[in-house]
Regions:
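Detector for C-terminal structural segments
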Residues: 8, 15-19, 69-71, 234-239, ...
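N-terminal lobe/hinge region of extracytoplasmic solute-binding protein
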Residues: 29-118, 148, 152, 223
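Aromatic- and charge-enriched surface segment that lines or borders ligand/interaction sites
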Residues: 55, 59, 80, 84-85, ...
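Gly/Pro-rich hinge or "lid" segments in bacterial periplasmic/extracellular proteins
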Residues: 72, 89-103, 192-265, 270-277, ...
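Aromatic-rich, solvent-exposed beta-strand/loop patch
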Residues: 107-111, 118, 133, 138, ...
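Surface-exposed binding/hinge segments that line
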Residues: 125, 159-207, 226-234, 379-393
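Ligand-site clamp/hinge motif
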Residues: 127, 216, 247-300, 341, ...
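Extracellular/periplasmic solute-recognition and catalytic clefts
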Residues: 166-168, 231-242, 267-331, 338-342, ...
């Protein structure tokens, strides 16, 4: 007579319940918890590392750094969809990124992490010593509450965390996240990036007895846990942060040599020209220059000549995403790809680069410029494996021609490109009609083709105006509208525009965020980053191929495939990029001999140099 499983357990002297518990214990013992997570298991630093290579372990603590910020703020809660938020809270996450690796995170609030090979779940062990600024311990309950609270508070988090099925406490200092899908390599990293919020604070009451609500704006400084805490807030004007002397994570390897300034201040300006004048007047210390004109002509003031201000180009190993004129394809006028293509033919980048930008820029031709993920030449065999099943839904040129932008380097080419644009508009049903003495593009219903460029900085008008002239030569009516930042944010969050300056930033390891940039669900969700309104099942499938890539080669192939599909659909009019940061600073700071590969590292790994500061003051 064969023995049943229950009989075997009895012979072993164990009850079924005890045996199951023993199996669970054995499984737990088989789990190899690690100190770090990486997208493809290529972790640089070992478990016993002492510090990151790009820091100065002997960096002095002290001094201050001041930043200028364009805009204003009426809210200090960074987790809600509402209001204009100021930087006043610093909440640690379970993990923190290394600045010299593409996609690796090391333990911060979490001391160790484990996931199975199929990435169906991830388990974190929390550090018992982790604390909020009020001294209360960071617990598993805080982690679990944070995930749901963030989902409720902001559409981005709700989308970003949508494949997290549940979070639950699995030990005294342990949290388990279970996922609704297997094979999504980025999901463990996404959970590691989540800021851990203090449940007791957000569910409590303020000093006036009012119930706090993470879904709403507030000017009360939220409780944090990081290395800095807000010390002074002047609504709409400035925020002063001070380093927490007894910060719980000071001695962790990920903290050594970082956060060296005693004070960080953010000073707000409503006008970019006023902000630059404030920098010249030593009202703040550090500036990343976004204006080619100012970079070429503006840094000739006395402090530069006296070497009090240093300008420097800092090259980075980073992906240059797509900055563009983003066309809102939710609107009928942009539904036909030929209209969108015509607008690219009308944009004279070469004239703008020579006459406005001092020749500093390279024309963007990819959503992954300056990286191995940029599509070049014709599709490879690996790319075709993704593309062929979708061939009937794709532009045929994608398979036969490398994507390039029209070039307007001569008067002849400008005329040629305008003729091509006119032919494309004709083919799309927008033909020229004389009306009130003007040549206008109209459709079959007699509606004129009109475009509004929505801007929030006057500096963009100098770029839009020459483009307007080219478009008007085609019979298109153009209105350039510059609004204040608050109105701009309201309109862009609800996609109330024809054309805006769009930016699709990319990391070295694209993943789940591509759904928010290009996914169909995001196209209909207010506040998403899908500014164009792309709702294409082909794009959705390729985005999934990115997310579920099994190795780096597969990820690169899927990104190149997405690049081809996006560019050949002409969703945007590409602008330009530069492969370095243009920086200017008052010369009061020291830095490591080698900066991290993927970040300028300011102010994280820089420090106050008292000797330099004294020299600047003496000049």
């Amino acid at each position: 007579m064969p023995l049943s499983r229950r009989s075997l357990l009895k012979l072993a002297g164990l009850s079924p319940l005890a045996k199951i518990a023993g199996i669970q214990m054995a499984l737990a013992e088989d789990r190899e918890f690690k100190h770090a997570l990486s997208l493809f298991d290529d972790v640089k630093y070992p478990a016993d590392f002492k510090h990151f290579d790009y820091v100065n372990v002997d960096a002095p603590k002290g001094g201050r750094v001041r930043f200028g910020v364009l805009g204003s703020f009426d809210n200090l809660n960074p987790y809600t969809f509402k209001g204009e938020t100021g930087q006043a809270v610093n909440n640690d996450a379970l993990l923190t990124s290394s600045l010299d690796e593409a996609s690796t995170e090391y333990g911060l609030v979490a001391s160790a992490v484990w996931h199975p090979d199929d990435r169906s779940m991830v388990i974190y062990r929390l550090r018992p010593e982790a604390r909020f600024h009020d001294g209360k311990a960071i617990t598993a309950e805080d982690v679990i509450w944070s995930m749901q609270a963030l989902r409720d508070a902001h559409p981005f988090y709700n989308s970003y965390y949508k494949n997290i099925a549940k979070a639950e406490q699995s030990g005294d200092h342990e949290v388990t996240f279970s996922f609704s899908q297997t094979g999504n390599r980025e999901l463990p990293l996404i959970t590691g990036q989540m800021p851990v919020l203090p449940k007791h604070w957000w569910t409590g009451k303020d000093d006036k007895g009012r119930q706090r609500n993470i879904n709403e704006t507030t000017l009360e400084v939220p409780l944090g846990s990081g290395s800095y805490v807000a010390a002074e807030v002047k609504p709409g004007v400035s925020i002063k942060m001070k380093r927490v002397a007894g910060y719980w994570g000071n001695d962790l390897p990920v903290s050594v040599g970082t956060d060296n300034f005693d004070e960080i201040q953010y000073i707000y300006f409503r006008d970019s020209n006023v902000m630059f004048e404030a920098f010249k007047g030593d009202q703040f210390d550090w500036r990343i220059e976004s204006s080619s004109k100012i970079w070429a002509t503006g840094y000739d003031f006395p402090a530069v000549k006296k070497n009090q201000v240093v300008t420097e180009k800092i090259a980075l190993k980073q992906v240059e995403g797509m900055q563009c004129w983003a066309l809102n394809v939710r609107r009928g006028k942009f539904k036909d790809a030929r209209v969108r293509q015509a607008l690219n033919h009308a944009f004279d980048f070469e004239w703008s680069n020579a006459n406005l930008f001092y020749g500093q820029y390279t024309r963007s031709r990819s959503y992954f410029n300056n990286s191995e993920m940029e599509a070049k030449g014709l599709p490879t065999a690996e790319e075709l494996a993704l593309l062929e099943p979708l061939r009937g839904q794709l532009p045929p040129e994608l398979f036969t021609t490398e994507f390039t932008n029209p070039v307007n380097d001569t008067p002849q080419n400008r005329r040629k490109n305008l003729r091509t644009a006119s032919q494309l508009l004709d083919a799309a049903g927008w033909t020229v009609m004389q009306r009130d003495g003007k040549s206008l593009r109209v459709n079959g219903q007699g509606e004129a083709l009109s475009l509004e460029f929505l801007l929030y900085e006057p500096i963009w008008e100098r770029v839009a105006l020459p483009y307007q002239q080219q478009l008007e030569l085609l019979g298109i009516t153009v209105n350039i509208k510059t609004v204040d930042l608050s109105q701009y944010e309201r309109r862009t969050q609800t996609f109330d525009y024809d054309i805006i300056v769009g930016s699709f930033g990319q990391s070295l390891s694209p993943g789940n965020e591509q759904r928010d940039l290009f996914g169909s669900e995001a196209a209909g969700r207010n506040g998403s980053r899908n500014s164009v309104g792309i709702a294409d099942p082909v794009v959705d499938k390729i985005v999934d191929a990115i997310i579920f890539s099994k190795d780096r080669k597969g990820l690169v192939t899927a990104c190149r495939t997405l690049d081809r599909v996006l560019t050949w659909n002409h969703f945007v009019v590409p602008m330009w990029f530069i492969p370095y940061e243009r920086t200017a600073r008052w010369d009061r700071f020291g830095r490591p001999g080698k900066l991290p590969d993927y970040s300028v590292g300011f102010p994280t790994v820089w420090w106050w140099d008292a000797e330099k500061a004294a020299k600047v003051a003496a000049k």
